């Protein structure tokens, strides 16, 4: 992982342009999430949209990954490889994507419902998404990384969901993955560095319906909940500007 590098306001504007295009890409994918569509078809939609807008997909070819998006269905947490699998009513699918625009990287994820889902799954998505914003609110000068982590954990814990521990948020902007790591639970063994002006982070809670443990499928990429419970994942690229958090991956 590339070391921490703070960004100037001009550089943050360029990351914002990348992240805004990324947000539009996810909207384009979302419009096509219906029962019967395959995750590969969604991948091609994202690829075409990014290329049409004179940018590059950040994931495609990264450490050998074949997709433009990670499409993780139901019990799959992250890094799902797009393929022939067709979405069905009652599924959920996490779409994680990255964009490189003019050399600047952004990273974003949302979990979408396919048709009608069980109320417990609705609650999982609602809580995971809300926890992201609780974490973002703590990304301000004067705080430390674990203030973000604790806010996410404190919000999720009363609901009894399992917070994934093996994977974290991270710095982003000049590269796809930069320092620091941003865990989604209070983990004192992580580097608890100070939040600084010009810091850009990808904050991304990953939360399972039941237990927190995860495993990796035989494809070497797809991470899934070990107890096969459904999993949600939400992520934004966020910068510290004038001491406060500014979400870059919103339109």
From Swiss-Prot:
Gene3D superfamilies, alphabetized: Creatinase/methionine aminopeptidase superfamily
Pfam families (UniProt xref): Peptidase_M24
Keywords: Aminopeptidase, Hydrolase, Metal-binding, Protease
Positions bound to a divalent metal cation 2: 107, 170, 204, 235
Keyword Protein biosynthesis: no
Record GO cellular component, one term: cytosol
Enzyme class: hydrolase
Cofactors that this protein relies on: Co(2+); Zn(2+); Mn(2+); Fe(2+)
A GO biological process held by the record: proteolysis
Positions that bind substrate: 79, 177
Positions with a binding annotation for a divalent metal cation 1: 96, 107, 235
Annotated EC: 3.4.11.18
GO molecular function terms attached to this record: initiator methionyl aminopeptidase activity; metal ion binding; metalloaminopeptidase activity
Disulfide bonds: none
SUPFAM superfamilies with a match to the protein in the record: Creatinase/aminopeptidase (SSF55920)
UniProt family annotation: Belongs to the peptidase M24A family. Methionine aminopeptidase type 1 subfamily.
NCBIfam families: met_pdase_I
General function of this protein: Removes the N-terminal methionine from nascent proteins. The N-terminal methionine is often cleaved when the second residue in the primary sequence is small and uncharged (Met-Ala-, Cys, Gly, Pro, Ser, Thr, or Val). Requires deformylation of the N(alpha)-formylated initiator methionine before it can be hydrolyzed.
Protein name: Methionine aminopeptidase
């Amino acid at each position: 992982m590339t070391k921490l590098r703070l960004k100037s306001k001009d550089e943050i504007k360029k990351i914002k342009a990348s992240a805004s295009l990324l947000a539009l890409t996810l909207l384009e994918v979302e419009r096509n999430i219906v029962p019967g569509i395959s995750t590969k078809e969604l991948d091609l939609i994202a690829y075409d949209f990014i290329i049409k807008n004179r940018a590059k997909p950040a994931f495609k070819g990264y450490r050998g990954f074949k997709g433009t998006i990670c499409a993780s269905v139901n019990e799959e947490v992250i890094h799902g490889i797009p393929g022939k699998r067709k979405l069905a009513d009652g599924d959920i699918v996490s779409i994680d994507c990255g964009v490189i625009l003019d050399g600047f990287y952004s990273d974003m994820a949302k979990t979408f419902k396919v048709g009608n889902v069980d109320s417990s799954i609705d609650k999982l998505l609602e809580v995971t998404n809300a926890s992201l914003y609780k974490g973002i609110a703590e990304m301000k000068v004067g705080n430390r990384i674990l203030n973000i982590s604790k806010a996410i954990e404190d919000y999720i814990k009363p609901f009894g969901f399992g917070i994934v521990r093996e994977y974290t948020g991270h710095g982003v902007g000049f590269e796809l993955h930069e320092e620091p790591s941003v865990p989604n639970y209070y983990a004192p063994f992580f580097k608890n560095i100070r939040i600084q002006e010009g810091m850009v982070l990808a904050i991304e809670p990953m939360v399972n319906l039941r237990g927190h443990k995860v495993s990796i499928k035989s494809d070497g990429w797809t991470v899934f909940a070990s107890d096969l419970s459904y999993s949600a994942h939400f992520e934004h690229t966020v910068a510290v500007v004038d001491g406060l958090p500014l979400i870059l991956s919103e339109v």
